[in-house]
């Protein structure tokens, strides 16, 4: 049995398979996931697990060089935006329209669905390198 880190075997597998500049999505319960993208559904009930809790755990194992966030989060969910910035203080952020973010999920290795139910609580993580 695994003792530390992300316990979900699907998330662990996807993270281990990530290469430089690969994408991994993490987001709220309402995000439409394209059929061609693997969906890892962690939602148990509304709010559980939270977006930030899942993001923090993923970041313990994944090197991230850049993130993509919906432009709309600035006005529709500024509290979540601040939490994301606090969680990823030294990572470049690119704001894109929410419609574009949803389309970009087609090229993500996977999407991790949380129980989060606040608007625009979605991010695409771009994998970096550890050297």
Curated annotation (Swiss-Prot):
Record localization: Cytoplasm
Keyword rRNA-binding in record: no
Assigned keywords, A-Z: Carbohydrate metabolism, Cytoplasm, Isomerase
GO BP terms, alphabetized: D-ribose catabolic process
InterPro entries assigned to the protein according to its UniProt record, in alphabetical order: D-ribose_pyranase, RbsD-like_sf, RbsD_FucU
EC number: 5.4.99.62
TM ranges: none
GO CC annotation terms, alphabetical: cytosol
The protein's annotated pathway: Carbohydrate metabolism; D-ribose degradation; D-ribose 5-phosphate from beta-D-ribopyranose: step 1/2
Keyword Cell inner membrane attached: no
Residues that hold substrate according to the record: 28, 98, 120-122
Predominant subcellular localization, coarse grouping: cytoplasm
GO molecular function, one term: intramolecular lyase activity
Reactions the enzyme catalyzes: beta-D-ribopyranose = beta-D-ribofuranose
Active site residues of this protein: 20
Subunit structure: Homodecamer.
Family note: Belongs to the RbsD / FucU family. RbsD subfamily.
Task of the protein: Catalyzes the interconversion of beta-pyran and beta-furan forms of D-ribose.
Record protein name field: D-ribose pyranase
Source species of the chain: Lactobacillus gasseri (strain ATCC 33323 / DSM 20243 / BCRC 14619 / CIP 102991 / JCM 1131 / KCTC 3163 / NCIMB 11718 / NCTC 13722 / AM63)
Organism ancestry: Bacteria, Bacillati, Bacillota, Bacilli, Lactobacillales
Gene: rbsD
């Amino acid at each position: 049995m695994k003792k530390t880190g992300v316990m979900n075997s699907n998330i662990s597998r996807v993270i281990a398979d990530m290469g430089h500049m690969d994408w991994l999505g993490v987001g709220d319960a309402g995000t439409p996931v394209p059929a061609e993208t693997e969906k890892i559904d962690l939602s148990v009930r509304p709010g559980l697990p939270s977006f930030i809790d899942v993001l923090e755990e993923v970041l313990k194992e994944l090197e991230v060089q850049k993130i993509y966030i919906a432009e709309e989060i600035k006005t529709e969910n500024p509290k979540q935006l601040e939490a994301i910035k606090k969680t990823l203080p030294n990572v470049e952020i690119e704001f894109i329209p929410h419609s574009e973010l949803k389309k970009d999920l087609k090229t993500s290795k996977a999407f991790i669905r949380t129980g989060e139910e606040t608007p625009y609580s979605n991010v695409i993580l771009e994998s970096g390198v550890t050297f």
